[in-house]
């Protein structure tokens, strides 16, 4: 009997790797995209915002479409495998393109801004194409109940560890090293498991999961109005989170380098390390807090109240960043990113539990 049939820990570890790879690609994007566009290609803060805008637009289309299609197709020996392979290979290629946007621009004849938008859009499309199938395959290959819960717990743990690792690499070795390591990890952690995991030809009843088409009245499922309330609240949270992802580098440049656009190589690398350490602190809090604090607290006061408290604390952190502005020391930034990490820990864990219980 194989590890997959026995549901051994090595199988769970292997099963978590494709989702981890996509999460790592996203972490590389968060740590390095704004920095490299500003420092290497000298794009203005407004143009950096335009490049980042491509991502959410891609996600709005790609995730729902792929989520619906991947339940109903079978090619390349799997239902999820094709999307995991396409997403993983494309994401790794787009990460590799980031340090070579000038060369890509020269080859295609597009301006540097247009090239950056195309690469960022394709990167986000690739991540979104892969994300749902990498999570769906966990449900496909595990029986409902404790085994499936364990599968998602493994995914969250391994993904969280690699998210912290991405920031550590950026802080210690620099963002260029992070990008190149990301290219290799995203490719290997997607491609190898995709060929080692054997998918069932037919989906059982327990594997038909989380499809929005299955919201039927009178069958004990979540009410659509309730879901919309949760989605709306979560959307406002992401206004703050996405703003941080895009513009923290500009905040740090204003606070610690006088807002100068003409930073030298050493100053630019220092700015990149400040950003990586900041996100590393946030990711570390987000990694350890759900199991150690949030889950026990939610059992006492409820999921919604716990999430509300965490988001309120995150808002205080953002408010302090805005209030202190350019007068904030570097250690102050790191401390406030730990405060923001409390909200981040809730954002990446509790909304899904709230939806399940609604």
Place the predicted regions along the sequence by residue.
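Intracellular loop-helix junctions on the cytosolic face of multi-pass helical membrane proteins
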Residues: 1-10, 102, 106-121, 125-247, ...
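Helix-loop boundary and gating motifs at the non-cytosolic
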Residues: 2-58, 228-265, 352
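Helical-face signature of the major facilitator-like transporter fold
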Residues: 15-19, 23, 56, 119-124, ...
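Loop-to-transmembrane helix entry
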Residues: 43-54, 147-154, 256-287, 331-335
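Transmembrane alpha-helices of Major Facilitator/SLC transporters
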Residues: 61-62, 272-297, 317
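Helix-to-loop junctions at the C-terminal end of transmembrane segments
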Residues: 61-78, 288-303
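C-terminal ends and interior cores of transmembrane alpha-helices
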Residues: 83-110, 312-327
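C-terminal transmembrane helical hairpin of 12-TM major facilitator-type secondary transporters
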Residues: 305-350
